[in-house]
Amino acid sequence: NPAGQFKDPNEALQRDRENFRAAVEAGERLGEEEEQAKRDAYLKTSAGNRLIDFIDGITASVNTPCIPTGFDELDAALDGGLYEGLYIFGAVSSLGKTTLVTQIADQIAQAGTDVLVFSLEMARYEIMAKSISRHTFQAARRPGGYKKGAKTTRGITAGKRYTEYSQEEKDHIMAAIDEYGQYAGHIYITEGIGDIGAEEIRQTVRDHILFTGNTPVVVIDYLQIMAPAEPRATDKQNTDKAVLELKRLSRDSKTPVIAVSSFNRASYDAPVTMAAFKESGAIEYSSDVLIGLQFAGTGEDGFDADEARRKKERKIELVILKNRNGRTGDKLEYVYHPLFNLFEEPTS
């Protein structure tokens, strides 16, 4: 305030001209300094001024390699695995998108990387049971494995059934639990119903890095039921906002973020395309990798979706609809065992 102790600049000029002039000049210098600071900050945004940071980023990336999903064909399509970015898996119901992403999370954890799973629909223990069920099935199929040991999720969690299980069946389940326990310490499951949004996810990631020193892979199941950023906004607006925030999270934390997306209007009989994600423009434009699941043979003459859905072994295709830094259009074939929560590549 150039007037200082006086009521206005006019009085200051009359009663203390020198100090008033000095105050005005100081204010002008401050304004010039602020303007220069803004100019310098703007000029630093040029690509030329960012080259050193760019080179430093390349050097730093040596210590943050891509993270394999555990599926060889998928990793090959993704240039080795998951990188910093937003990965979205979408499908109609009954194609196993939650099972697939949960299995990917487990396989990442088995390799020693922490994974944060935000389950907005399934309970924590149900997710754990799905993983243990998968292990019972895999063990039962090994040479000399106990065939009756393969158990569904319900077969794992329903305590009453244990009164009817043989000791060998119980031992088989306990062995699967032990196998799961070998990497379960790398999996952190947060469950919620309508109360987990982008900010809660960001804070949990921040806390995990602070408390463990590890940057986790982030999994959200699923996108459309995240807590709305603005309750009065439309579903589309809130989904768009969530996608943008998850993209920002992946960039700020330099980690892969995987989100499951539902298809509300897609048909089982129509091949999956980018149009299935049109309900949210942000999914289409902000995601780095967009993968749609469909039954093998979808769209071909004679294809029967109901018959495909009834099979105990379902042939599923992963279609790479968008890959910001790689090939698009690839179709990867998988065999899905819905009873035992397992996806496998035919060549495995």
What residue ranges belong to the model's regions?
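Conserved P-loop NTPase "ATPase switch" module shared by AAA+ and STAND
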Residues: G213-A229
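Conserved nucleotide-binding/hydrolysis micro-motifs of P-loop NTPases
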Residues: G4-F6, E121-Y125, S133-R134, I193-I196, ...
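The Walker A/P-loop phosphate-binding site
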Residues: D40-A150, A175-D178
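C-terminal regions of RecA-like/P-loop NTPase motor modules
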Residues: P143-G144, K151, I156, D178-Q182, ...
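Flexible beta-alpha connector loops of hexameric P-loop NTPases
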Residues: T163, T190-D195, P228-D240, S267-A275
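TOPRIM fold recognition
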Residues: N1-L51
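Cytosolic-facing regulatory segments adjacent to core modules
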Residues: A76, Q110-G213, P228, K331-E333
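Proline-centered loop/turn at the N-terminus of a beta-strand
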Residues: D114, K254-P256
